[in-house]
Amino acid sequence: MNVGIDFGAVLAFGLLAKFDIDKQKELQTKVNEKMERKKEMKGASKTMKEREAILRSLPLEITVGVDGTTRTASVGELQAGAKQHIIIVTGPRKACTDALIGANLLKMDFAMSNILVVPYDMDSDSGERPSGGFGEKPSYETQPYIARPASDDWADYIKGEMNDAVKQSGEQARKEGIALVVANNGKVIRRGVGKVPWRQMVQQLENEVNPSPEGPLTWL
């Protein structure tokens, strides 16, 4: 009888010990995964900060006269000197076109809010993307608030942003396009995939330089 009781106790202890070990392994796995995610997020944050610095050095072609006269200036110069905010839209041609048509409805808001819109059509290679002048284009592509990438150096920057978007949102980012909202302090305050909510982004840029007590708007 005593032997039976002792055997049962040993068996129960063994099962409890195994359960405890399994739980410890599961907990350690979760801890390791959490640490790895934090490490990846820290690395991604560092990469994005480095990319912000690269963005400031990239040149844009802007319209400076009613006759269509253009000049070239870096993003950093436009931010520091003219206090310009920048919204970059990139993706396939259709995504860029849809975004520019939507932007055209708010063109007065862009003028009043010092916002430049930078379209980057990823369907075109560097040979097809014009480096100077606006040529014969639809009116929504030739508005004064439209700025054009003025060098091939933009390709690497856009590629990095798109790769990050694909990691977070899947391949739909390549199909639907992405938008980046850059305040005139050089900070990228919003990244989004798909249809561009222009009115909300204009308001968010206003909140960035003139914070309201209600806090920032959400990305729609």
Language model features: what each stretch is:
Residues 1-220:
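Non-catalytic interaction/Regulatory regions outside core domains
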